[in-house]
């Protein structure tokens, strides 16, 4: 697996450093100061949530048995999931959606636009390959969606949300996305007082299917509370659970902030690295916010942070000679290599080894220490790819866009490593076969990498090109095809959408791997869509990122 590392002929002076400037995190020690509630209060919160949960389960069972109430059942399932409490009723919901799919007499042919769209989206999101021909009844003789639908704002919004679960060949959904986007924008402009305008505005910015589940739940709770027909029990369930889980997240973030502060990595680096623990934890909540994934979050955040420093070393400080030594040391993965590294690199290298050894200790009680080797191999591969990009920058080499995506950039975004690390804390569902599959760079992992890499490059290329840096996908595309920046971004955006179709196909039955593992990959794509939509809100974390962290990690929701 190891590849030789050769020093390229110098083009840029070997000791010139491409130093970047990163602002400090706006959060400081905010989460370190968090004081968890006492055990009595915690137990009371848990008991209250369980009590309401039982009431919701009773209502769900009642709706499942009711004859002639398919719309109520669809709406109930959707609200439960959008409130963020679907994980508490996961098996009940799976069984009901299976029954809906199996029921030829469910009545979808008689549904209006909103409920047809809801039926379609729910089934697709639960893995059922239902045909988009079901929307044919809303088209005119010309084969296009009827303009008369424009007055049905709720229905248009539902169709818009459904269009984002499209796969390759779903031409009707491609048409639906264009049609609904046009009409929803008109609603915002021409009907600013329409009660659905806040929800429409949010959806146009962040489609539900591509949104970070935890953040989307926070927004939906606010929208649902203003719905005059909301179910009070469901709303209470969503709020109570949100606050309970938020308390857990804040306790975890406090502990992880202490871990990072004790490492003192930021102070030990001779350059301004991205000191982003709350931001990194926010990213971690993308793949898994549910309480049972605490170990997954610990692993992901710790790898995220130590890798972020390594990334900054390759990308924003190290000379080519230093990076050659670091890459060789990474390939050997041995503490004896410390003597061969500059002082500042010793700190980062030692933290890498320490972190992965800690993972082995954490997983030893489960008999799963063996799985850490897969993450370690991906970390080594990441260093090789970082080095490849550093050589390109050093040699002033501009790869074609295809070469850039194929040889380096997809891996350097971290999805291959991130996917394997996601699997580490998942328990027995993450078999050796699953790790081998993930390390084999399957189509879906490549698609996720393309989404991440291209969205990152589109959002950050102006900042990155303000210093010595490998060309982004935008620059590579411009040079390869002789187009302007706007055209390059539009064409790369099409590749992002095509990759999303690959992701959506992955989530349809029969699953290539257990669904819990595939969901982590889907959720990684979702968090990237949130963080890199139009900007790099991880690097520049004092605007959109700060607002999003505030939404889900600061104040509880008033009951």
Swiss-Prot record:
Keywords: Lyase, Magnesium, Metal-binding. GO terms for molecular function: magnesium ion binding; terpene synthase activity. Mg(2+) 1 binds at residues 311, 315. SUPFAM superfamilies: Terpenoid cyclases/Protein prenyltransferases, Terpenoid synthases. The Asp-Asp-Xaa-Xaa-Asp/Glu (DDXXD/E) motif is important for the catalytic activity, presumably through binding to Mg(2+). Catalyzes the conversion of (2E,6E)-farnesyl diphosphate (FPP) into drimenol, a precursor of the sesquiterpenoid polygodial. Polygodial has been shown to be an antifeedant for a number of herbivorous insects. This is (-)-drimenol synthase. It comes from Persicaria hydropiper (Marshpepper knotweed).
